[in-house]
UniProtKB/Swiss-Prot annotation:
<dbReference type="InterPro" id="IPR015919">
    <property type="entry name" value="Cadherin-like_sf"/>
</dbReference>
<dbReference type="InterPro" id="IPR050174">
    <property type="entry name" value="Protocadherin/Cadherin-CA"/>
</dbReference>
<dbReference type="Pfam" id="PF00028">
    <property type="entry name" value="Cadherin"/>
</dbReference>
<feature type="transmembrane region" description="Helical">
    <location>
        <begin position="690"/>
        <end position="710"/>
    </location>
</feature>
<keyword id="KW-0677">Repeat</keyword>
<dbReference type="GO" id="GO:0016339">
    <property type="term" value="P:calcium-dependent cell-cell adhesion via plasma membrane cell adhesion molecules"/>
</dbReference>
<feature type="signal peptide">
    <location>
        <begin position="1"/>
        <end position="30"/>
    </location>
</feature>
<feature type="compositionally biased region" description="Basic residues">
    <location>
        <begin position="913"/>
        <end position="923"/>
    </location>
</feature>
<comment type="function">
    <text>Potential calcium-dependent cell-adhesion protein. May be involved in the establishment and maintenance of specific neuronal connections in the brain.</text>
</comment>
<dbReference type="InterPro" id="IPR013164">
    <property type="entry name" value="Cadherin_N"/>
</dbReference>
<keyword id="KW-1003">Cell membrane</keyword>
<dbReference type="GO" id="GO:0005886">
    <property type="term" value="C:plasma membrane"/>
</dbReference>
<dbReference type="Pfam" id="PF08266">
    <property type="entry name" value="Cadherin_2"/>
</dbReference>
<feature type="domain" description="Cadherin 5">
    <location>
        <begin position="451"/>
        <end position="560"/>
    </location>
</feature>
<feature type="domain" description="Cadherin 3">
    <location>
        <begin position="243"/>
        <end position="345"/>
    </location>
</feature>
<feature type="domain" description="Cadherin 4">
    <location>
        <begin position="346"/>
        <end position="450"/>
    </location>
</feature>
<keyword id="KW-0812">Transmembrane</keyword>
Length: 923
């Protein structure tokens, strides 16, 4: 037994012979276990060893899973020892009230196999309630004419305990005039009556103060007191008399409040005030259910009666006359049961979750039905409502099992509302429903699904490292870890070592972050393969592709390719004939931008001009043309400051300075050049070393070429091939394009032949007159070098050679009217004996053709060896061909296309230039 229970808590198995006989016919009849314990046992107290009483061994307990199934959790079973323990407070008065016998009945459930055992625990009363009076004081009026032996009913006390622990005795404080008698009602409750021992004399003493004590026989006994104030009144020698000492009446529990129960009557032989009778309840507790008319004695129902709560009422009435004398009677009210209680459905042993892969017939819950009515009004049947994958099986009397009846799928129905309806057999029958919600547990049977089949995101270059560039989302209809999705990068078209330095992804949110600033010029797009994986076991996953497009920003300023500084850092100049008409193409500013799109769309603007209005600049082409003819007052040397802006926001720009000289020949320019101061000795020395280095490289190159040609001719064994070899010197300079533009989007490349010297002496290169069309045009008599603007103390003057007629366009070859001059074949051009001036014009032509892309200059066979392999990203479809307007000092002819050279014809003016070169050598 548990603590405090003693032998009273000892298990008492009640073998009965007739149960044994019945068991022969009913083998499935369950055995009932009885225990007796006192109330108010502490939580955890042992009621008895339920496992032992049921015949279970300790080894069977883990598999049998013995537990208690009851409406309220008063008891629990220890999983280790099988002992029945008290789990909540046991208050007998709260559980059973004044019932003489109090017992709790419940079922003990054992699994494997499933069995039910009826357990009865009788709760014994302890003396835990003190008798209490309904009032702390009573006032009693007694006539002085009252005779000794007259009895007066006093207010009774109430004790919630039963048996010996309830109210047993009343005691009155010692008095010469009064004594006390204990009386008992028909229901067993006791009440006190005070007896007058000696006559009273109002003139001697008007009142008396007594103490009434109520005692029980508990251990230890408890008591309470009430004060009695006795007032002595004048004589009234006749007390009221009821027509009956006891009234009995039967009343249905469904009567409405206000219904008359009965009417009592009383008479008084006195007259006047002493004969005026008033009725009242002797106990205040009776006024909760009934009402009494104090004048007529009519008793009516005050509140609704309930057979299940109280089956019988015992009411004590008092009749008091005007003189203060009273009489009492008892009214016994029997309550008749009606079918006024609907059955109740109580679910027990409910699981938290039912896994969606549960098998058919899986036990889900235990439910009980209860009806407070008696006899056939309390017999109940129940059924399951709705179309649900469950069914109800009868387990025992008023006990049912809920089991699965179909396959469950949480994704279709994550929960079920189960409604069980119970109906009794009363007339009319009553029914009630009880609903519970069963939650279906998840199984990882769904893989994550991305919101899109693929993702494409645009990211502007120069983004801050760590910035969010995109977010992918995947959903998983599963719950808990089965539906928790994490993200990772599975693959990419980047190098594996570089992947972590480019992007990363948040495993929780799917946000993709840039780990570095992207550069559109280096990386324009890349693709990632992302994976979403749930946390189930085994885990399920899905992949999706994310393509990242790096958008361009205007982060590169334009770069001017032409005009460029000379090899010695000096500025170059362009010559314009004096006779240039308005619209004459002077030169072209060539610039590139490493950006793309509108960020690389360049425009050209004149910021400053020494003679405003003399030249015009193409907004998109960068072509510098004469806006009017040269005036007498115009300076020979002109300077233009040109700004090149891109189309970005904000736009970036670069500037270039053009030096233009109006002259028909180089002779006119040389005096102006000689006026300039000599460069410093350091620069002259540097130029000297550069010239020596170039000369050595050229000599080595020529020697290698001569040896290669000689070997080839010897192998061919053709003497005629040796006659084509002429001693000469061909030099090809390095590209003037900045190195960083070799990988840009819009770079240009030019091949220049420049005479480098620290002095003003001009050096010319000679080549054989019979050059093939595939050779560099610089291998002729003329030198095509651009002259840097530098000082020289020694200048050699040369006469201008006659025009080279082979450099003219035929009528069919002319580009049209885009130039400013007519371009007829007989047009007069200034003569020039220096072939280097022709090269300057060719560079201008190639610069213009870099944007055209369709010219024969800059790459084809028979061209001047100028490579226009770079062009702007935008194509000027209608850029005019200005080759016919390019001024070539020393020649009045326009440029000839490559077709003429492919015919193998040498220029007509070549001999003249060669002769001039010979004169220079002689000098």
């Amino acid at each position: 037994m548990g603590s405090g229970a003693g032998e009273l808590g000892r298990a008492e198995r009640l073998p009965v012979l007739f149960l044994f006989l019945l068991s022969l016919f009913c083998p499935a009849l369950c055995e009932q276990i009885r225990y007796r314990i006192p109330e108010e046992m502490p939580k955890g107290s042992v009621v008895g060893n339920l496992a032992t009483d049921l015949g279970f061994s300790v080894q069977e307990l883990p598999t049998r899973k013995l537990r208690v199934s009851s409406e309220k959790p008063y008891f629990t079973v220890s999983a280790e020892s099988g002992e029945l323990l008290v789990s909540s407070r046991l208050d007998r008065e709260e559980i059973c009230g004044k019932k003489p016998a109090c017992a709790l009945e419940f079922e003990a459930v054992a699994e494997n196999p499933l069995n039910f055992y009826h357990v009865n625990v009788e709760i014994e009363d302890i003396n835990d309630h003190t008798p209490k009076f309904t009032q702390n004081s009573f006032e009693l009026q007694i006539s002085e004419s009252a005779q000794p032996g007259t009895r007066f009913i006093l207010g009774s006390a109430h004790d919630a305990d039963i048996g010996s622990n309830t109210l047993q005795n009343y005691q009155l404080s010692p008095s010469d005039h009064f004594s006390l008698i204990n009386k008992e009602k028909s229901d067993g409750s006791k009440y006190p009556e005070m007896v007058l021992k000696t006559p009273l004399d109002r003139e001697k003493q008007k009142s008396y103060h007594l103490t009434l004590t109520a005692l029980d026989f508990g251990a230890p006994p408890l008591s309470s007191t009430a004060q009695i104030h006795v007032l002595v009144t004048d004589a009234n020698d006749n007390a009221p008399v009821f027509s009956q000492d006891v009234y009995r009446v039967s009343l249905s529990e469904n009567v409405y409040p206000g219904t008359t129960v009965l009417q009592v009557t009383a008479t008084d032989q006195d007259e006047g005030v002493n004969a005026e009778i008033t009725f009242s309840f002797s106990e205040a507790s009776q006024i909760t259910q009934f009402d009494l008319n104090s004048n007529t004695g009519e008793i009516t129902v005050l509140n609704t009666l309930d057979f299940e709560e109280v089956k019988e009422y015992s009411i004590v009435l008092e009749a008091r006359d005007g003189g203060g004398m009273i009489a009492q009677c008892t009214v016994e009210v029997e309550v008749i049961d009606e079918n006024d209680n609907a059955p109740e459905v109580i679910f027990q042993s409910l699981p938290n979750l039912i896994m969606e892969d549960a098998e058919l017939g899986t036990h889900i819950a235990l439910l009980k039905v209860r009806d407070k009515d008696s006899r056939h009004n309390g017999e109940v049947t129940c059924k399951l409502e709705g179309d649900v994958p469950f069914k109800i099986l009868t387990s025992s009397r008023n006990t049912y099992k809920l089991v699965t009846d179909a396959v469950l799928d949480r994704e279709q129905n994550p929960e079920y509302n189960i409604t069980v309806t119970a109906t009794d057999r009363g007339k009319p029958p009553l029914s009630s429903s009880s609903s519970i919600t069963l939650h279906i547990g998840d199984v990882n049977d769904n893989a994550p699904v991305f919101s899109q089949s693929s993702y494409i995101v645009h990211v502007a270059e120069n983004n801050p490292p760590g910035a969010s560039i995109s977010q992918v989302r995947a959903s998983d209809p599963d719950l808990g870890p089965n539906g928790q999705v994490s993200y990772c990068i599975m693959a990419s078209d980047l190098e594996q070592r570089e992947l972590s330095s480019y992007v990363s992804i948040s495993a929780e949110s799917g946000v993709v972050f840039a780990q570095r600033a992207f550069d559109h010029e280096q990386l324009r797009a890349f693709e990632l393969t992302l994976q979403a994986r749930d946390q189930g076991s085994p885990a399920l996953s899905a992949n999706v592709s994310l393509r990242v497009l790096v958008d361009d920003r205007n982060d590169n300023a334009p770069r001017v390719l032409y005009p460029a500084l000379g090899p010695d850092g000096s500025a170059l100049f362009d010559m314009v004939p004096h006779a240039a008409e308005p619209g004459y193409l002077v030169t072209k500013v060539v610039a590139v931008d490493a950006d793309s799109g509108h960020n690389a769309w360049l425009s050209y603007h004149v910021l400053q001009a020494s003679e405003p209005g003399l030249f015009s600049l193409g907004l998109r082409t960068g072509e510098v043309r004469t806006a009017r003819a040269l005036g007498d007052r115009d300076a020979v040397r002109q300077r233009l400051l040109v700004a090149v802006r891109d189309g970005g926001q904000p736009p970036l720009s670069a500037t270039a300075t053009l030096h233009l000289v109006f002259a028909d020949s180089l002779q006119e320019v040389l005096p102006d050049i000689t006026d300039r101061p000599d460069p410093s000795d350091l620069q002259a020395e540097l130029q000297f070393y550069l010239v020596v280095a170039l000369a050595l490289i050229s000599v080595l190159f020529l020697v290698a070429m001569i040896l290669a040609i000689a070997l080839r001719l010897r192998r061919s064994s053709s003497p005629a091939s040796w006659s084509c070899f002429q001693p000469g010197l061909c030099v090809k300079s390095e590209s003037v394009v900045p190195p960083n533009y070799s990988e840009g989007t819009l770079p240009y490349s030019y091949n220049l032949c420049v005479a480098h010297t620290g002095k003003t002496e001009f050096n010319f290169l000679k080549c054989s007159e019979q050059l093939s069309s595939g050779q560099d045009i610089l291998c002729g008599d003329s030198s095509g070098a651009l002259f840097p603007l530098c000082n020289s103390s020694e200048l050699t003057s040369h006469q201008q050679a006659p025009p080279n007629t082979d450099w003219r366009f035929s009528q069919a070859q002319r580009p049209g009217t885009s130039g400013s001059q007519n371009g007829d074949d007989t047009g007069t051009w200034p003569n020039n004996q220096f072939d280097t001036e022709m090269l300057q014009a060719m560079i201008l032509a190639s610069a213009s053709e870099a944007a055209d892309g369709s010219s024969t200059l800059g790459g084809g066979a028979g061209t001047m060896g100028l490579s226009a392999r770079y062009g702007p990203q935008f194509t000027l479809q209608h850029v005019p061909d200005y080759r016919q307007n390019v001024y070539i000092p020393g020649s009045n002819a326009t440029l000839t296309n490559a077709a003429g050279k492919r015919d193998g014809k040498a220029p007509a003016g070549g001999n003249g230039n060669k002769k001039k070169s010979g004169k220079k050598e002689k000098k």
